């Protein structure tokens, strides 16, 4: 019988159901006053909020272990005949973080009880992972723009928010990993089941895009009101974590307790107290209108005390906003002189309101006010069957819609829903089973139109289609016009997509003396759908003058694509955490990834599509491989008995099993199997297709780190880490030699990508008895690669070498700092001044980083296709690269005289990403007042300010030499980081780098 991984997975399911990644694990040692092990001590752990209990006994070495504990606050009771009983309250267990609590039992009667309070050690003495926990207290207190997760993710060292693209919207990088390599889980199951809204859905179809709303926010995963806490792990995670090599973000949702608790809130902002956009000020425009209402509530409590609990949450947002934008558009003279069939394309752009820029272009500065909205609701139930079995179920639903644009408008409509169920069973003192199942569904529809009323209706572009097809009445098209130096204009239905996920996660935990063994499996099926029924026409001009004259244009036509693929993923792992010595714990294990090629349904429009995939009569899109084994090892050592000092280190292999590349040929358009016609080479035309390099394998990352941690005074912790990684066989899309010809071009997905990252990271956790609580992180690092994106297309020639494109990563950030600080003034009695000063709280988030690297390009098009690396210019000697200009945004701009275009389609001597853009710094703060209403209820009033100092943070300069705005920044940073969709980042009003904005909050909480 042939080997089938699916059969192996089914056997594993029968044998080893699994423990969820969001659980915590408690262990420790029980000793007597002489430091000898106490055997047979009874340990009882009880959740202080729900009453849930688990028990264990200490072994021959005095050690104990209790697995599968939900994050929360616990009471631990330790009893042994001949010793006094110890009860420790307030032991906080955190998401995806093992905890250790040791006890020394005094000699005496067991009826005598000693009560102490305090949690586990502040130091991680259990594993080598580099990570950061964000708890409920910090979630509630921090000023979070848009009340989203993205601001909190930046608090982990090594993480940086990055510009999103239409193809990849990961929105942040972690320790040099690409932005589309992060894995999000909620309550132990994957929430990387989002769907993109753009024409390049590659990240979403492969299951590497988290569930987002139409605004690009992560509320599609979980609203902050329903989030208990989360942990971000960025290096050398244990074998139970995997699928993607980037950050592992483990989210835990809130549940009910024995006491009713809840909140009702309203977040409001408008432009009255806001600062004006820097570009609007320069233009003499007033502040842009802004209306934001974020409202909702939550309620949790018992259905039956100590047994059944519920938690409900709802959040809704209504937003109308606009942004100042500067762009080059066709001049009035150009519109009048253009050929009749060209004029409809020019009218997609708004009419100029600024001075001439030359070559038929003029300046336009303007703003578009557009509405956005989302609603997200969730319900969770928890039930305990005695002290051994717990059950839970969770349902969520999140519809959303957003409109955004500068010269054109994009309307995106999305829906997502999810159902999760889980069971946890302690079958014996040494064995715990856990199984979870998730079903998720998401859909999106994207439409484009122009803000210029002269653009008319869809059939307004009939003269364009007649020019190329000579058939009247062709109106049902999506049009995309790209002009070097200007950008692109889009009209029509861009995409109609869906995504379904089935996810089954079983695991087992065995506690055997000094060993804690975990083994399990992870089975996921994805079904990305494409329902695009509209043909697409793309026109590209290398310069604007050619467009006006209707010559030297590349044209591309794509037929409608409708179909689906079925992607199956199987993972398995086994690991052992071995307490070799009371001060040394070693964790080692293996993870196995199986990611076969997808099963594709026939496409009605392209029944021969599969034939285009194959090389040398391959029967699969790429070879099936069963040897994707990833060993990992780590150790934590406490070298000194009486010092709170720990040294940790680890190493591991991590596969990128995302299958985004598997559906590029089906979903990676919009121009799939398109025919590009270049009049310069007439009568020839170029057939553009997509394919995979023969022998394609999963990308691989090697990660390693060494960390030293020191605790101070039982409250503060300083961590110093060296973190490194090396990416091999990374995906890189290439077009050109040697497989392409003049009449047939193939864009190949290859394994030619490579990367390196080295970083020094410092984190300081502060908790002062005077009411000060802080978390600070600094990173000094360098990330290098020859491609920073799976979806970007690279030009290669016969003379191309991999080192030609090697340079700083697109997201390389040499220096980055983040800090979260809270200060609480305790209520006072006495004078009116003392009473007024009390109950005030101040919170702040600080962010600062150096600039992103940029590359000047002499041309972004070749063969009618946009490239990430085509073509870099030559650097002219004797000229400064940057010149000071007080009139330019940021006071400087790139010097056009420093760059000259190559004489042919070749790379110049300017290195990739050898220039750096503007740095960023911003302070957000919140002033809060708590007004007690009774012992359990209070009214919270908050005043939040984002970019409190109103420091202008500028976007990177325009990089195309063909643009009249070359070298100058077109907007503030928030517009570069995102434009507001899951395919192009979080909406700018919630991004870092915008003008100062003020928010007022009223919240009732009990």
Describe each model-derived feature in a short phrase.
Residues 222-225, 239-242, 256-261, 304-307, ...:
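Short loop/turn motifs that connect adjacent beta-strands in outer-membrane beta-barrel proteins
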Residues 112, 121-162, 166-171, 176-431, ...:
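Acidic, glycine-rich flexible loop segments
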Residues 152, 223-224, 291, 583, ...:
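Short, solvent-exposed micro-motifs at the edges of structured domains
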């Amino acid at each position: 019988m042939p080997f089938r991984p699916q059969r192996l997975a089914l056997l594993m399911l029968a044998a080893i159901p699994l423990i969820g990644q969001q659980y915590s694990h408690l262990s420790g040692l029980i000793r007597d006053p002489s430091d000898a092990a106490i055997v047979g001590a009874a340990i009882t752990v009880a959740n202080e909020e729900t009453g849930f209990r688990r028990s264990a006994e200490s072994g021959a070495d005095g050690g104990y272990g209790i697995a599968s504990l939900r994050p929360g606050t616990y009471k631990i009771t330790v009893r042994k005949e001949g010793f006094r009983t110890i009860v420790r309250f307030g032991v906080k267990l955190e998401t995806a973080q093992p905890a250790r609590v040791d006890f020394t039992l005094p000699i005496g009667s067991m009826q005598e009880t000693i009560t102490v309070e305090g949690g586990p050690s502040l130091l991680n003495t259990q594993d080598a992972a580099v990570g950061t926990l964000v708890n409920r207290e910090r979630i509630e207190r921090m000023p979070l723009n848009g009340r989203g997760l993205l601001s909190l993710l930046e608090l982990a060292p090594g993480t940086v928010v990055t510009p999103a693209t239409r193809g990849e919207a990961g929105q942040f990088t972690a320790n040099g990993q690409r932005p589309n390599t992060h894995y999000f889980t909620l309550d132990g199951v994957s929430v990387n089941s989002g769907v993109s809204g753009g024409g390049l859905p590659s990240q979403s179809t492969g299951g590497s895009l988290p569930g987002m709303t139409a605004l690009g926010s992560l509320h599609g995963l979980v609203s902050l009101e329903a989030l208990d806490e989360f942990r971000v792990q960025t290096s050398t995670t244990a074998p139970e974590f995997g699928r993607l090599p980037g950050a592992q973000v483990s989210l835990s949702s809130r549940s009910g307790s024995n006491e009713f608790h809840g909140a009702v809130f309203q977040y409001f902002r408008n432009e009255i107290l806001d600062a004006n956009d820097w570009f609007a000020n320069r233009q003499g425009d007033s502040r842009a209108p802004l209306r934001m209402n974020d409202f909702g509530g939550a309620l949790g409590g018992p259905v039956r005390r100590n047994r059944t609990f519920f938690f409900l949450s709802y959040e809704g947002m209504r937003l109308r906003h606009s942004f100042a934008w500067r762009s080059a558009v066709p001049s009035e003279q150009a519109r009048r002189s253009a050929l009749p069939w060209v004029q409809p394309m020019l009218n997609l752009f708004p009419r100029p309101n600024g001075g001439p820029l030359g070559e038929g272009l003029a300046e336009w500065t303007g703003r578009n006010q557009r509405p956005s909205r989302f609603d997200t609701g969730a319900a969770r139930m928890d039930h305990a069957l005695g002290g051994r079995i717990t059950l839970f179920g969770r349902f969520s639903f999140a519809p959303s819609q957003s409109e955004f644009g500068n010269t054109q408008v994009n309307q995106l409509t999305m829906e997502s829903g999810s159902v999760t169920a889980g069971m946890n069973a302690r079958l014996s003192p040494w064995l715990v089973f856990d199984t979870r199942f998730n079903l998720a569904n998401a859909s999106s529809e994207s439409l484009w139109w122009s803000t210029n009323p002269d653009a008319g209706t869809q059939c307004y572009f009939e003269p364009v289609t007649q020019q190329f097809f000579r058939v009247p009445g062709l109106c049902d098209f999506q049009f995309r016009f790209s002009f070097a130096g200007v950008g692109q204009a889009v009209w029509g239905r861009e995409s109609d997509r869906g995504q379904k996920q089935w996810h089954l996660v079983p695991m087992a935990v065995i506690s055997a003396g000094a060993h804690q063994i975990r083994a399990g499996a992870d089975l996921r099926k994805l079904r990305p759908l494409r329902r695009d029924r509209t043909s697409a026409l793309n026109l590209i001009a290398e310069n604007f003058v050619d467009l006006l004259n209707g010559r030297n244009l590349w044209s591309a036509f794509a037929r409608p694509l409708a179909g689906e693929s079925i992607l199956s993923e199987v993972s398995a792992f086994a690991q052992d955490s071995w307490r070799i010595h009371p001060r040394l714990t070693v964790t080692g294990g293996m993870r196995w990834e199986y990611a076969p090629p997808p099963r594709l349904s026939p496409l009605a429009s392209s029944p021969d599509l599969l034939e285009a995939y194959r090389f040398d009569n391959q029967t699969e899109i790429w070879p099936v491989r069963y040897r994707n084994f990833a060993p990992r090892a780590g150790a934590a050592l406490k070298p000194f008995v009486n010092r709170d000092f720990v040294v940790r280190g680890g190493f591991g292999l991590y596969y990128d099993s995302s299958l985004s590349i598997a559906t590029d040929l089906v979903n990676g358009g919009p121009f799939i199997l398109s025919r590009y016609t270049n009049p310069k080479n007439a009568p020839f035309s170029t057939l553009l297709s997509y394919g995979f390099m023969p022998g394609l394998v999963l990308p691989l990352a090697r990660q390693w780190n060494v960390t030293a941690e020191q605790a101070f005074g039982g409250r503060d912790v300083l961590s110093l880490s060296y973190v490194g990684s090396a990416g091999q066989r990374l995906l890189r899309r290439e077009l050109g030699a040697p497989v392409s010809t003049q009449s047939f071009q193939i864009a190949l997905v290859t394994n030619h990508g490579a990367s390196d990252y080295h970083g020094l990271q410092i984190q300081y956790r502060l908790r002062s008895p005077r009411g000060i609580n802080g978390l600070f992180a600094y990173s000094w690092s360098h990330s290098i690669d020859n491609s920073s994106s799976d979806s970007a297309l690279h030009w290669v020639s016969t003379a191309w070498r991999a080192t030609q494109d090697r340079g700083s990563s697109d997201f390389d950030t040499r220096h980055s700092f983040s800090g979260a600080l809270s200060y609480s003034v305790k209520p006072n009695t006495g004078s009116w001044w003392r009473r007024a000063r009390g109950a005030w709280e101040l919170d702040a988030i600080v962010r600062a980083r150096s600039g992103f690297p940029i590359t000047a390009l002499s041309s972004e098009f070749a063969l009618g296709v946009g490239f990430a690396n085509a073509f870099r210019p030559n650097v002219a000697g004797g000229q400064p690269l940057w010149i000071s200009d007080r009139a330019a945004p940021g006071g400087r701009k790139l010097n056009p005289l420093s760059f000259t275009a190559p004489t042919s389609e070749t790379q110049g001597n300017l290195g990739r990403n050898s220039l750096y853009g503007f740095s960023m710094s911003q302070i957000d703060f919140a002033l809060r007042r708590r007004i007690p209403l009774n012992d359990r209820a209070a009214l919270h009033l908050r005043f939040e300010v984002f970019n409190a100092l109103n420091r202008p943070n500028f976007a990177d300069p325009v990089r195309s030499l063909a643009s009249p705005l070359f070298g100058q920044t077109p907007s503030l940073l928030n517009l570069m980081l995102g434009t507001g969709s899951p395919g192009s980042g979080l909406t700018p009003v919630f991004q870092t780098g915008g003008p100062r904005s003020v928010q007022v909050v009223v919240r009732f909480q009990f």
